[in-house]
Regions:
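Acidic/polar active-site rim loop that often engages polyanionic ligands
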Residues: 102-105
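Active-site-proximal segment of RNA-dependent polymerases
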Residues: 5, 13-15, 19-20, 163-165
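Short, compositionally biased "basic patch" segments
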Residues: 113-133, 147-148
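PLD/PLD-like phosphodiesterase catalytic module centered on the HKD motif
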Residues: 26-100, 110, 115-117, 142-313
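Pre-Walker A segment
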Residues: 1-7, 148-152
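Short, glycine-rich nucleotide/cofactor-binding loops
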Residues: 7-13, 173-177
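A short acidic, amphipathic alpha-helical/loop segment
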Residues: 15-22, 180-184
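Gly-rich Lys/Arg/Thr-decorated short loops/hinges at beta-loop-alpha junctions or inter-strand turns
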Residues: 1, 128-138, 163-165
Length: 313
């Protein structure tokens, strides 16, 4: 019946774009939000947008003064007799780009949960200027993301103050926003144990009196770590989220970003296991010290490589 997708970066001669064109030619209603301000991809995005428009796809172009960085898709279905069928939502940390997909490590959630489907539909209507945004499940930058992040951090501070052990693990590409960094410093001072896995720029300084409970890990390996995954302990009832934004001012305040909670217990456990594996890595991981220098972890002689142990398991 209907397909809605955001396009931030796609490969040249994209199989994704070709599939959307085929869907439109087969009578499906297809809407694509094209971000023309994606740096270095402006020309390719404009060319693919014109190609899709010529095939009958509805194209929505960039919002002035605002980037849409969310990586999302929605499929709404009806049966042959018009009856409603389950709809599907997809929320990812990476672009719909088969070229970078061979080089980047990302995560995506494909779900038919109604609360996520409904929120994503509201997001697409918002991008078309048709809806006052109301999000009950998704966290969306410029709307409810910052208040929810503050609430989640405050919850861990409350647990630490009660002696119940606040715990936060954050995996991202970059950590730069001063307000969120100060929130993490405050949580550390209250005793919240915080692990950060930050591949790129990190403006938080570990190893200080105000950050003594914060440890920063960096992993550079065969694939570019691109996933954004956030874990909040919540008194042994963990809340896990994944989505498109890094904790940079541009992502949190000047872009449309989408983050989903991971509600399925098995999927949540898989992401927690991934975080723990990366925190335990003793082959490619390094610490970021108080001088913001990379200090590679040293394996004790005789200690096996965590990566080898996992690959042979």
């Amino acid at each position: 019946r209907e397909i809605m997708v955001t396009q931030y970066r796609v490969a040249e001669n994209s199989a994704v774009i070709n599939t959307l064109i085929a869907a439109a030619q087969n009578g499906k209603k297809v809407t694509v939000f094209v971000e023309l301000k994606a740096r270095f991809d402006e020309e390719n995005n404009l060319a693919t947008a014109e190609m899709m428009q010529a095939a009958g796809i509805k194209i929505i172009y960039s919002i002035p003064g605002l980037k849409v960085h969310a990586k999302v898709a929605l499929v709404r279905r009806r049966g042959q007799n018009g009856e409603k069928l389950p709809s599907y939502a997809y929320i990812s940390t990476g672009n719909f780009n088969e070229k970078t997909a061979t080089l980047y490590a990302d995560c995506g959630l494909f779900t038919c949960r109604k609360e996520i489907v409904n929120d994503l539909y509201n997001l697409f209507r918002t991008l078309q200027g048709k809806e006052d945004p109301k999000f009950t499940t998704l966290l969306v930058a410029r709307f409810n993301l910052i208040p929810e992040l503050n609430r989640l951090i405050d919850r861990e501070i409350e647990l630490a103050d009660q002696g119940k052990g606040g715990r936060i693990i954050l995996k991202m590409n970059a950590l730069q926003d001063p307000a969120m960094i100060n929130r993490l410093y405050n949580a550390s001072e209250h005793g919240v144990q915080i692990d950060l896995i930050v591949r790129g720029i990190c403006c938080l300084i570990p190893g200080q009196s105000y950050s003594r409970n914060i440890r920063v890990t960096r992993i550079v390996d065969s694939f570019l770590e691109h996933a954004r995954i956030w874990y909040f302990g919540n008194n042994h009832h963990p809340k896990v989220f994944m989505g498109s934004p890094d904790w940079m001012r541009r992502n949190l305040y000047r872009r449309i970003e989408a983050v989903t909670p991971i509600l399925d217990p098995d999927l949540r456990a898989s992401l927690i296991e991934m975080l723990n594996i990366q925190l335990a890595d003793n082959q490619k991981a390094c610490w970021v010290d108080a001088q913001l220098q990379n200090v590679f972890k040293k394996r004790t002689p005789g200690t096996p490589s965590v990566q080898l142990a996992i690959s042979s398991a």
